Amino acid sequence: ALLLPFDDKRMVEYYEGFLMAVDSLKRTGTSIDLYVYDCNKESSSLNSILAKSEMKNMNVVFGPAQQQHIKPLAAFAKKNDIRLVIPFSSKEGEVFNNPFIYQINTPQSYLYSEVYEHFTRQFPNANVILLESAVVDKDKVEFIKGLKQELGSKGIPVKTLKENAPVETLKAALHNDKENFFIPTSGNDLTLLRIIPQLTLLVRDNPEARIHLFGYPEWQTYTKDHLESFFELDTYFYSSFYTNNLLPAAINFTQTYRKWYSKEMEERYPKYGMLGFDTGYFFLKGLSKYGSELEKNLPQMDLTPIQTGFKFQRVNNWGGFVNKKVFFVHFTKNYELIKLDFE
């Protein structure tokens, strides 16, 4: 069952992508009974849906979109042994005491340990220079603190400079025998605008040095503005979802979506049509293949996502699953775009 507010364009697009997943699976012989309910923000709307007799027999429910519906829907799912896939909200505590919940949009702090591990494995020979933002980015304090600890424990050198440090100071921090990573302590666009000019000069003046910029998921929303710089600065960022118009799977999906619906997906990150497809395909394929044994076989679910990857981990013995999948996206100096998948 899908429970979504269809007065929200994003949810309509999610549903459209989901239908494409259902169609793909039906073509391979999978039988699916799909129930779709328009669930607006009133609690009476949710209650009337949950009162329907067929709801108790669902194998999986996708939704809700509204924060206030999560608790009652999660309680219903738990009572009736139904998997609940929450694709949108990341600010949800229900997953910690409900074994039936799958949280797709992971709280950032859960991803940090994955990012640190991938970074130190991928770049054991790194020299990290943190560029301290003039304005503290509260969202990144925990990330930077954990990163410093992790790098320290792996013997990777870390230095902190002000974001407005002159090129000479940046140059003095370089190690010629290492991969030099500049990591700002803020993920916002203003910080990028401040640091890119100095780093660009540094790279041009020191062509022999191995210099990279490393950052955050939100950078994909600014890619259009900084594409040239991202390539020149050999940039990486981490994210649990990523797509671009150059990847074959994305091109195919976008063309099919256009053909089905005679429109483009909205320009936002993540793209909701792709999110609908990826979540629908993963869980419906998994249930058709493994049925009630799905949870035991999650690691065997080897699918190439269009945008959102999945790597589910139970949060504790009595809780549900969070998605700990992380990609690194790399803009190389050769103008290549590479999605690094670590699994």
Language model: regions and residue ranges:
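Extracytosolic ligand-binding ectodomains
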Residues: 1-343
